[in-house]
Amino acid sequence: KTDTGFKIVTDFSQYEAKAVVATTRDEIIACAGSKYQPHPQLLGLREAAKAGLKRIAITCTPCNALSVRKMMLDPDFEDIVGNIVLVISNICGAHWSRHGTEDLITEWMGLKLEDVAGIKYRARPFPGQFSVTLKNGEVHEKGFVRGGGLGRLAKFTPEECRYCLEKVASVADIVLGDTWHHHVLSPDLLDKYTEEEIAKDERIPLAKEGMTAVVVRSEIGQKFVDAARADGAIKLYDEPEDTARQFLCAVHDLGKPICNGPVINTRVVRGQPVREYV
């Protein structure tokens, strides 16, 4: 018997990423935006299957896209993944632990976790503000990409991300991401153009507002993109094959191989497992 007691209750729900089954346009839009935090994305698949959904599109990281494809090849998972018709992934550098988000809120922003009502990692304007809405309605913001928030997350990189080279989701139907490393539209180039140069290329002012690179990797993905384009839901600027290849090579080669290469080599020397790519 004790006369006193205590318990610690931590509510992560206001800033923890989670899988969501969205069935309406508004629900999909509410889920939009980058989530720089790992979360069990595939848990939503079972929920979608239980709901009886017959045509399922899933958005996930490249590593989760690979898991989905493996499940789709295994008859034991037919009841869960049998109705997936589209796999959409993102260009991925890493997914930093929830502790990284907590560090941004408490140490970088100087706020209390228990006061948080919601967060956005990359609120407008582009390339993004780390935005924290408090329960009292106050909104606090700092530059996430250019203000140091993104770089601060590096020390919270999970081990599994340190030896991953899967950046542009080779097994997804469609891959979406920023235009970093594009020879014209990379965000670090956009403020360097003259008014004359901007007037000659209508993509540049649009890119300043935030432009998405779209990589189509399958016939199913192409049909989906073509339908969205025909309906006027999206506006696309087609790239010549050599330009697209140059962009994708830059995204891959200037990203994970440089950052993760030394880690992978060290693991090989130590006899530790690494991912094999063929």
Task: Label the model's feature ranges.
Residues 1-278:
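Iron-sulfur-associated redox domains of electron-transfer enzymes in respiratory
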